[in-house]
Amino acid sequence: MLNYLATQDESKCCGCGACVEICPQKALPMKPNKEGFQYPALDANRCVDCKLCEKVCPEMNPPQKAEPLDIYALQSKNAEELFESSSGGAFRLVADSVIQQGGAVVGCVWNEKMEPVLTIADSLDGLRPMQGSKYLSSSTEHTYSQTKKLLDAGRMVLFTGTPCQCAGLLNFLRKPYDNLLTMDFLCHGVPSQMAFDAYREHCEKQRNGKMSQYKCRDKSAHGWAISESYCVNGKKYTAHGMTSPYLFGFISGYFNRYSCYTCKFRGLERFTDYTISDFWGYQQKLHNHDGISAFQVNTQKGKEFMTRFEQNARYHIAKREDVAVENPAILHSHEENVPELRKTIYQQIQTDGWAVVEKKYLRCRHFYLKKLWYALPDHVTIKLRKLKH
């Protein structure tokens, strides 16, 4: 099979960066395309045709997958960590245990330019910025090679990332490590940095200041729901997912990288030790609205390690069908057509600006009614929902 470097077919590159790090000649720098997605750019003068880039490419050589051993509805008992988590705090449960045993954790944080990047933490304090979803493409930086050094030195490492980033790491390592744990999540695709920056700059222009402390998921706004928040000039602004133009575009699949639409790594079968996601709908069974994770244990190694943190969690055995009610990607590989608006939106962001694109394409049905609804206090909306039923 021909890869992206041979075809320049953007759907054949997931942007994991494994080829960049494995190249002994440094002949594959990552460069953004017009839409802001990073792709390897071959320097033919440096290339010695060693084919290592092809060997580690997860698009060409996806890791072998297997069905999960167990699926749980899981929630951390630590109220503070639960509040800061997007759903049930599954990441912190595993990560805390790894750190407490002298290990290191690879996770995604915002840098000073408001770009998501993978970094390595070896303290509990370093885990806090890794919590919470970041709904755009992240850079792996040099974390594959740094992870390998830690593993070779005998340190335990928890590597967390998108499914394709985890696949890139496993291919980069080229052998199994007993001291490695991997955790991915049910991924809905990744927007580009350019799309997010256009939205951020639009918000900054509206608010006359610089954005900081952006959160894709903020429980202080509407509890466990998809609600964004950010600060400008010390003032906090919030929006429910369907009234945020950026999150509406993300949920609708308008911003995704082309490889996301034919992702090889979706579905119930996985190659990581753990897979986490929101367990939407399960809160009715538990009468708990603080956030619940669907926690999928995929390997025997993951099952054995769970005994080290299970006492810090509330959990129940669940069925895959329970998760699939609101997360159909857990059962299906979910190949889908590229939305017709996708190319138009990216083109018009560049030519007309975010404000035009937002007004034309990024407003949900009944936009103003939804804005009014989510402006109401929680106790009012709860009473209105009860009246409806």
Please provide the spans of the model-predicted regions:
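Short, intrinsically disordered, charge-biased short linear motifs at domain edges
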Residues: 1-10, 41-45, 242-251
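Flanking helices and flexible, charged tails adjoining ferredoxin-like Fe-S electron-transfer domains
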Residues: 1-2, 45-153, 323-341, 347-357
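Iron-sulfur cluster-binding cysteine motifs and their immediate structural context
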Residues: 2-5, 18-41, 51-68, 273-274
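Local cysteine-cluster metal-coordination motifs and their immediate loop/turn environment
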Residues: 11-26, 48-60, 162-168, 255-268
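Gly/Ser/Thr-rich loops at beta-strand to alpha-helix junctions
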Residues: 86-89, 112, 159-169, 189-191
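Long, compositionally biased charged/polar accessory segments in the mid-to-C-terminal portions
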Residues: 101-104, 204, 208-389
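Short, surface-exposed basic-aromatic patches at helix termini and helix-loop junctions that form
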Residues: 170-181, 200-205
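Short, flexible loop segments at boundaries between secondary-structure elements
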Residues: 181-202, 327
